[in-house]
Structures are given as C-alpha cells and as structure tokens.
Amino acid sequence: MLNKNKRWYLIALYDIYQGLLTTKQCEYFNLHYFKDLSFSEIAELKEVSKSAISDCLNKVCDQLLKYEQALLIYEKNKKRNDLYTLINDSELVKKLKDI
C-alpha cells in the first residue's frame, strides 16, 4: 500500500506523462488510482491475472519516476509555483502563469 503522498505524487506524474504510456497502462492506472479498484477487481474486470495487473502497474510507476528523473517537469513546475508564492503582486503572478 502506498502512502498518501506517494500516491498523489504518482497521480501528478501521470497527469504530466500519461501520453508516454500505452492505452492498457493508462486504463489500469485509471482504474486503480482514480476509480480506486483493487488489483483483484481490475483483474476480474479485465479477465487477466492479479499478477498481470500488479506487474503492469509497477512498470507504470517505474516509468513515471524514470520520466520525471530525466525530464524534471514536475519538479520545475513545483519550484515555479513555490516562487509564485513569494511574489506579492497578484497581477504579475497571473501574467507569469499565463506564459
């Protein structure tokens, strides 16, 4: 079982990198992380083994972490958002976010 922070981190990475995953990987990720289905429930629904679901989702998580390690899109967005909080001018913050 993932802790809550890691779960949200993986969901954030998925939002960024889902276009790099296969249709099946996206489907399993959505069922588990967004629909909150267990591996057993997904396996029954998709008529595959529980271990196939587990293997696929472990691979997806590894890929998402690998993509972030290489591209750092999440990390850069987080740093950028942290800097926005230091700016007192809300008009300027809005303009910067629109870029």
Swiss-Prot record:
Pfam families xref list: UPF0122 (PF04297)
Disulfide bonds, paired cysteine numbers: none
Function of the protein: Might take part in the signal recognition particle (SRP) pathway. This is inferred from the conservation of its genetic proximity to ftsY/ffh. May be a regulatory protein.
PANTHER family membership: UPF0122 PROTEIN CBO2450/CLC_2298, UPF0122 PROTEIN YLXM
UniProt record similarity statement: Belongs to the UPF0122 family.
NCBIfam families reported in the protein's UniProt record: PRK00118.2-3
Protein name: UPF0122 protein UUR10_0158
